[in-house]
Amino acid sequence: MLCLADIRIVASCSAAIKSGYGQQPWLAHVAGPYANSLFDDVPADSYHAAVEYLRLIPASCYLLDGYAAGRDDCRAHCIAPRNRRLYCASYQVCVCRY
């Protein structure tokens, strides 16, 4: 839990960042390349593997349970490539958003 002193420090730092007060112009120039290269080192293969893993979890949740075999059309519709937002509900129901 944050104490009052921590909250004040965070508030003053965020206010300084938003207003630009206290920042030297050369600091942004020096830190810019480092800030922009944070995600450059992540290989594209690991990103695609993470996406496929997230799509595999709902697929196993929806298609491999044997409780509601009559809802396979709904489950297959949720796993379709154009429907990106899908998740496993606690009651094993097909939940997808377009």
Swiss-Prot record:
UniProt-listed GO biological process terms: defense response to bacterium; innate immune response; response to bacterium
Keywords: Antibiotic, Antimicrobial, Defensin, Disulfide bond, Immunity, Innate immunity, Signal
InterPro entries assigned to the protein according to its UniProt record, in alphabetical order: Defensin_invertebrate/fungal (IPR001542), Scorpion_toxin-like_sf (IPR036574)
Cystines in this chain: 61-88, 74-94, 78-96
Triggers of expression: By bacterial infection.
Assigned protein family: Belongs to the invertebrate defensin family. Type 1 subfamily.
Protein name: Defensin
Native source species: Mamestra brassicae
Species classification: Eukaryota, Metazoa, Ecdysozoa, Arthropoda, Hexapoda
